[in-house]
Amino acid sequence: MWAFLIISTLAWGIAEIFYKKGNLEKEKYSHLKTTVFVGFFMGIYALVILFTQGVDLKLFPKNFVLYLPVALCYIISMVCSYFGVRFIEESLSDPIENSSCALVAILCAIFLHETYSVPAIVSIAIIAIGLISVSFFDKKGKNTRTNKFGKKLAIVAIAMPFCYMLLDAVGTFLDIFYTDDVTTTLLVGVTEDTIEHTANCAYELTFFLFSICVLIFLKIKKIKFFDFGENSQEKHGFFTKILNQKWKILAAIFETIGQATYLFALSEGGGIAAVILGAGTVITSLILSRIFLKEKLTWIQYTFIGIIMVGIIMGAIFGL
């Protein structure tokens, strides 16, 4: 269990740093290019899962279609994240995005009439207070973004982590109907051993097809995929072009590594795995952002990020 947990946590934390370095504010479509790279590597791993983990190949096309609503929620949330990180600090966006567990609990309470223990409710309140406060005390960042990008883009940028949180929460909520119980799942022909892998494979192949659609869009827009910038007229060799996109490629590779290991970590580790994955990824990205990206928030923001972390850990422990 610990090997999978450590690999998944580190991989996703490192991926966040490469996302920031690869999604450049001056490169208009960098977030879409990142989406293409992630989809490509996800597609490769999906084929590995499809042929090695006992997924029913005959029924998979039907399960692929059935799982589309969930997969699209997850994928679009990630595109929002890629766009937002072009303009805001990774240290700020990641804790917000990883707070979706609180929103999932609220959705379950409203639509499934689930009840929660007092500590679980307290954890939701802690996360909510932290989220509101960390964005409220982002005055310096707001002013900087407004002066640099304009008021409209500054608002859109800070909204992106919240869009990720919302869409990821909706996807996780819908996932309950697919992967929570093999006897009531909307998927067909799955067992306890294959239900998670079937859903995971459907998500990854959807990401691959989504990335192809994005690539077609970029082609229609006449965007040169490997250009240094949208207006670049310079001629570069193939390997130079690949090297220029190294941060996006590395982000996609580490994202896929995290995706490849987290299911095994969760299946073996239960609640403690959820705590480490949720909190560990944020802590890793915070530390790496400070070291490699030289990001520095105010002490008030770090305080409220710490409060969010406490809420996330409590939520994982008490069953959110």
Model-derived segments and spans:
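Glycine-/small-residue-enriched transmembrane alpha-helix faces in small-molecule transporters
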Residues: M1-S30, R145-C201, I253, L320
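Loop-to-transmembrane-helix transition segments
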Residues: M1-S8, F37, L50, D56-C80, ...
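Transmembrane alpha-helices of multi-pass small-molecule transport proteins
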Residues: I7-F18, E27-I76, I126, H197-D227, ...
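Hydrophobic/aromatic residues within transmembrane alpha-helices
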Residues: G22, T34, G84, I110-Y116, ...
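Membrane-interface helix-cap regions at the ends of transmembrane helices
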Residues: M42-K62, I110, S133-R145, F208-N244, ...
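Hydrophobic transmembrane alpha-helices of multi-pass small-molecule transport proteins
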Residues: A46, L107-C108, V118-K139, I300-G319
